[in-house]
Amino acid sequence: NILRKWEKNNHYQAILKHHKGQPSFILHDGPPYANGNLHAGTAMNRSIKDFIVRSHAMLGYYTPFFPGWDTHGLPIENAIQKLGVDRKSISVAEFRRKCEEFAHSQITTQMETEKRLGQIADYEHPYISLQKEFEGRQIRTFANMALKGMIFQGLKPVYWSPFNETAGAGSENI
C-alpha cells in the first residue's frame, strides 16, 4: 500500500531533505479541536493545507509543516460529557484530567485518519495546545507584547452561556 511505502521510505523527510537550504514556505496551521473523529470540514481543511504545502515543495521551497491540535475548550468538554462524564460529580482537576486524556486519544485518531487520506506532515513533532512548552511560548509572547505596550485594558461584552456555564468565544455568538 502507498501509505506504508511512504512511511518506510520516510517520504516527508526526503522531501524536506531535498529542498534543504532553499527559501522556506511556512503554512501556519490553525488547529482543529481534538474532540472526536475528523469531520468532513476538518478533513477538507487539512487536505487543502496539504495541497498548498506540497505545491510549494514542487516549486522548490523548503516546506516544513507541523500539524497542530487545540486541546482546550468547550468542544472537548462537551464531547466527554456526551460519553457520560458528569462534570458536576467530580472535581475540577479530575474533569480536566479526563478532558486531557480524551483530547490526546483523539489526536492519535485524527492523525491516523489524516495519514490515511494521504496527507504528509511532521507528525512526529505536532504542536498541541496542552503541551507545557506551547503554553510557555504563549506566556512569553504575551509578556513581550505587554513590554511593547501592545496590551491594553478596555470594556467589551462577555457572552455568557447559562446552559454551558461558560463564556462563549465571539465567533460562537452569531
Locate each region found by the language model:
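N-terminal, positively charged nucleic-acid-binding surface of large information/translation enzymes
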Residues: 1-174
